[in-house]
């Protein structure tokens, strides 16, 4: 234990963040050595054990793992058990896998004006549209007023989608694309900035390729 503690101490002095085993070994060694001197009480050593390491001295998550350190140490008058609860002060950082949730609900796409549009699937297979797909360029078997939906996407959470079953009609909400509003790819109807000039080109391409009849 003493050797492991000394090794951990040297690593700490070099700026190496300690792992779980090293942290426990260093705290235990410090308590053990001060107990041997006979100048401190059990209460003193419990306090000392919480001063050996800080959260920045250990690897992420170690402070949360070390709930307590218990060690039987030799005092001049015999062996006593020293227990140190939460020996490594947490600096408020997130623990691995931890979630911190807000008390209030999160408003999706807050501040963005949404419009509603009725969409019908005229095909014989389901059609699924992702959150950031340029709705103007969706499958040509989806029937809706495409011209007025240029530069818009679904008003749903990022990474989710809406599924249109064969023959189904449903109303969805659309919002303008954010950011720089540069749209590329999809069905190759618009490749560039969302503006009136590119809208005219996109409409012409949509009519030529059968997206608008």
UniProtKB/Swiss-Prot annotation:
**Segments for region (Urease beta):** 91-213
Q: Which GO terms describe its cellular component?
A: urease complex
Q: Which reaction does it catalyse?
A: urea + 2 H2O + H(+) = hydrogencarbonate + 2 NH4(+)
Chief place of localization: cytoplasm
Species this protein is from = Helicobacter mustelae
Gene Ontology terms describing biological process: urea catabolic process
Question: What EC numbers are recorded for this enzyme?
Answer: 3.5.1.5
Family note: In the N-terminal section; belongs to the urease gamma subunit family. In the C-terminal section; belongs to the urease beta subunit family.
Stored HAMAP family: Urease_beta (MF_01954)
Q: Where are the annotated segments for Urease gamma?
A: 1-90
Where is this chain's protein located in or outside the cell? Cytoplasm
**Oligomer status and interactors:** Heterohexamer of 3 UreA (alpha) and 3 UreB (beta) subunits.
Q: Which UniProt keywords apply?
A: Cytoplasm, Hydrolase
One example of the protein's molecular function in GO is:
nickel cation binding
Q: What Gene3D superfamilies does the database record attribute to this sequence?
A: Urease, beta subunit, Urease, gamma-like subunit
Judged by the first EC level, this protein's enzyme class is hydrolase
Lineage, opening ranks: Bacteria, Pseudomonadati, Campylobacterota, Epsilonproteobacteria, Campylobacterales
Q: What is this protein called?
A: Urease subunit alpha
Q: In which pathway does it act?
A: Nitrogen metabolism; urea degradation; CO(2) and NH(3) from urea (urease route): step 1/1
């Amino acid at each position: 234990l003493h050797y492991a503690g000394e090794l951990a101490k040297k690593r700490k002095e070099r700026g190496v963040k300690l792992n779980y085993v090293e942290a426990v070994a260093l705290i235990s060694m410090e308590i053990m050595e001060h107990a041997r001197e006979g100048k401190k009480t059990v209460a003193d050593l419990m306090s000392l054990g919480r001063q050996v390491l800080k959260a920045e001295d250990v690897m992420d998550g170690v402070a949360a793992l070390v709930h307590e350190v218990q060690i039987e140490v030799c005092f001049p008058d015999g062996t006593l058990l020293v227990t140190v609860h939460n020996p490594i002060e947490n600096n408020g950082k997130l623990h691995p896998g931890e979630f911190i949730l807000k008390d209030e609900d999160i408003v999706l796409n807050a501040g963005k004006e949404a419009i509603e549009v009725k969409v019908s699937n005229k095909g014989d297979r389901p059609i699924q549209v992702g959150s950031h797909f340029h709705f103007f360029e969706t499958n040509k078997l989806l029937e809706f007023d495409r011209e007025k939906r240029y530069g818009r996407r679904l008003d749903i959470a990022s990474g989710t989608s809406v599924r249109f079953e064969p023959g189904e009609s449903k109303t969805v909400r659309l919002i303008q694309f954010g950011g720089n509003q540069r749209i590329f790819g999809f069905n190759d109807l618009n490749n560039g900035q969302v503006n009136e000039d590119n809208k005219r080109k996109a409409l012409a391409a949509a009519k030529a390729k059968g997206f608008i009849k």
